A protein has these predicted regions:
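Nucleotidyltransferase catalytic core that binds NTPs
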Residues: 2-234, 243-245, 275
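Phosphate/ribose-recognition catalytic cores of enzymes acting on nucleotide-derived substrates
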Residues: 224-279
Length: 279
């Protein structure tokens, strides 16, 4: 496994692999990898000749109240995990090589103004910008994203379509702990009591899945989910919403494919979860 730290050396390696006719898969990450990331890398390994993992804490997706420096980092552990999973290359650039001020941004506004975009207004602009940069640097045949970040996945798909990237976007299932909590680096911030309280998210997902059906009013589903979360004293709802699976806009009734998503604070830690329903 190789590690590159500049755009130039990454492109040189990719160029050689392309000359050999190799297919390339990319798993974009911000590091501090867990089993959710591992599932993406495994899927990528199954479907491509070359597996590239980006390990880059992207500064442009952090808002003014979000602490970039506090984001957890452990590149040694990340690289060991990637090597065990059969990755061929880790792209680990310095921010100064990725961004030169002033720099351009990529933004998909129509899908970014609901759900997480309401309270994190610059987040998806930063995500789209760094992902488009990685796509241009790595030029992968396929790129892998987790469905836990469902709004992000929808935005990336839209960006690829609108900007004519010749890349297949592969969405991979949410990976959960044995008790149902969705895997996340943020879980490490939870105290023992908060960790137990956080299970209200997966219980709410289960209640929503048990309730939803074609034609039902969105509020009937969302009310049951909110009740479960509101019964937990340590939980504070950011949002619990049902949106169109394609344009991320709110729906009043289940008449097409939908995404049911939530963001909930457990203490000071913001967690997300979701499920999809196909009509």
């Amino acid at each position: 496994m190789q590690v590159t730290k500049t755009v130039q050396e990454t492109r040189a390696l990719i160029k050689n692999w392309k000359k050999e006719g190799k297919t390339i898969g990319l798993v974009p990450t911000m590091g501090f990898l867990h089993e959710g990331h591992a599932s993406l890398i495994k899927r990528c390994r199954e479907e491509n000749d070359i597996v590239v993992v980006s390990d880059f804490v992207n500064p442009t997706q952090f808002g003014p109240t979000e602490d970039l420096e506090a984001y957890p980092r452990d590149f040694k552990r990340d690289s060991e995990l990637c090597e065990c999973l059969g990755a061929d290359l880790i792209v680990h650039p310095d921010p100064t090589d990725m961004y030169h001020d002033p720099h351009a941004f990529v933004s998909i506004d129509t899908l970014s103004d609901t759900l997480c975009g309401k309270t994190r207004p610059i987040h998806f602009k930063g995500v789209c910008t760094v992902v488009s940069k990685l796509f241009n640097i790595v030029t992968p045949d396929r790129a892998y994203f987790g469905q836990k970040d469902a709004q992000q996945l929808a935005i990336i798909r839209k960006m690829v379509q609108d900007l004519n990237f010749d890349i297949q976007i592969v969405g991979c299932p949410i990976i959960r702990e044995e008790d149902g909590l969705a895997k996340s680096y943020r879980n490490t911030y939870l105290s023992e009591k908060e960790r137990t309280a956080a299970l209200c998210l997966s219980r709410a997902v289960k209640a929503g899945q048990d309730t939803i059906c074609k034609g039902i009013k969105a509020e009937e589903v969302l009310a049951k989910m909110r009740a479960i979360i509101e019964a937990e004293p340590l939980a504070k709802i950011d949002y619990v919403s049902m949106v169109d699976a394609l344009d991320m806009q709110p729906v009043e009734r289940v008449e097409k494919d939908v995404l049911v998503a939530m963001a909930v604070y457990i203490g000071k830690t913001r967690l997300i979860d979701n499920f999809s329903y196909e009509v």
